Amino acid sequence: MKKNGILNKELNTLLASLGHTDTIVIADCGLPIPNEEARIDLALVKGFPPFLSVLDAVINELVVEEIVLAEEIKTQNPDVYESIKARMSDVPIQFVRHEEFKEMTKQAKAVIRTGEATPYANIILRSGVNFS
């Protein structure tokens, strides 16, 4: 058994497979997922696991060079938006309209579905490299 970090086999496999510029999505429970094969469904019940807990676990193990958020998160879910900014203050943010965000998810290697049930609690993470 792993000593610490992410225990989910599919999520570990995904993170280990990412190369530079690959993208993944962490999504609330309502975001449409375009490709069933690329879904890692962690949702257990409404609200669990929360988006921010999953984000924390992933960014603890992944080099992120850029994030993409829906523009609407700023006004429709300011608490989650501020929490993302606080956690990832050194990572550039690209903002797009929600419809464009949904189109961008089609290019992601996978969508990680959480139980989050607040609006626009979705993020695209672009993988960086761990070179010094």
From Swiss-Prot:
Substrate binds at D28, H98, Y120, A121, N122. It catalyses: beta-D-ribopyranose = beta-D-ribofuranose. It is found in: Cytoplasm. Keywords: Carbohydrate metabolism, Cytoplasm, Isomerase. GO terms for molecular function: D-ribose pyranase activity; intramolecular lyase activity; monosaccharide binding. Pathway: Carbohydrate metabolism; D-ribose degradation; D-ribose 5-phosphate from beta-D-ribopyranose: step 1/2. The active site is at H20 (proton donor). The keyword Isomerase applies. GO terms for cellular component: cytosol. Signal peptide: none annotated. The keyword Cytoplasm applies. Pfam families: RbsD_FucU. Gene3D superfamilies: RbsD-like domain (3.40.1650.10). GO terms for biological process: D-ribose catabolic process. Its EC number is 5.4.99.62. InterPro entries: D-ribose_pyranase (IPR023064), RbsD-like_sf (IPR023750), RbsD_FucU (IPR007721). Homodecamer. PANTHER family: D-RIBOSE PYRANASE. Belongs to the RbsD / FucU family. RbsD subfamily. Catalyzes the interconversion of beta-pyran and beta-furan forms of D-ribose. This is D-ribose pyranase.
